[in-house]
């Protein structure tokens, strides 16, 4: 039984993946397993219920045994549409979102973000990563939010809002800085995927 039963985990796999050639990114192999499997394996100890946000290939995603939630908005409306789909189906106090294409995300992501949310009484906490030079980079799709933000998000989307940072600015939000920048490496292109496999010592 997870310590985080009050947190629903949402894997964002609903994008168009244009830079991956339009292939459904969650089903692309990484180190011998689809990216969605890596996401599930890292999330399963950090959340209670798990949802998968997908807008195609529902039958293939359903094989993993978790509910599939599609965007209400048409035409691949971006991660905020995925957030809205997850919040609409979220039955717990909090929703933790992660993208399907960052297979090395921190195993203490949920714990640290949950603590920050409680400490600051925020509506929403997002991750940031710090590189070797000390520069901090926002990682906004790694996000823990209270389910009460759904109304705000739906209103933002109805006004054709798409930019995550603009929606965050409407809420009480804060960030947690993770020093391991590599944990947030993503795989937007086939070359990035192969480079990340190589960095992990994987030889196909």
What is each residue range found by the language model?
Residues 2-161, 166-185, 190-204:
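Nucleotide and nucleotide-moiety/phosphate-recognizing core
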């Amino acid at each position: 039984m997870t310590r985080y039963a009050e947190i629903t985990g949402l894997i964002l796999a609903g994008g168009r993946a244009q830079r991956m050639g339009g292939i459904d990114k969650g089903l692309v192999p990484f180190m011998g397993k689809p990216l969605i499997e890596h996401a599930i394996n890292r999330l399963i100890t950090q959340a209670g219920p798990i949802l998968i946000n997908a807008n195609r290939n529902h039958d293939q995603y359903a094989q993993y045994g978790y509910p599939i939630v599609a965007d209400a908005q048409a035409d691949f409306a971006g991660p905020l549409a995925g957030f809205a789909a997850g919040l609409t189906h979220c039955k717990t106090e909090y929703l933790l979102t992660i993208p399907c294409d960052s297979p090395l995300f921190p195993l203490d992501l949920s714990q640290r973000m949950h603590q920050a949310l409680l400490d600051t009484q925020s509506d929403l906490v997002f991750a940031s990563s710090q590189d070797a030079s000390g520069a901090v980079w926002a990682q906004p799709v790694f996000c823990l939010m209270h389910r009460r933000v759904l109304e705000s998000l739906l209103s933002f989307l109805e006004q054709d809002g798409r930019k995550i940072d603009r929606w965050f600015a409407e809420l009480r939000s804060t960030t947690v800085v993770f020093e391991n920048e590599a944990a947030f490496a993503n795989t937007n292109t086939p070359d990035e995927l192969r480079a990340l496999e190589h960095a992990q010592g994987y030889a196909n």
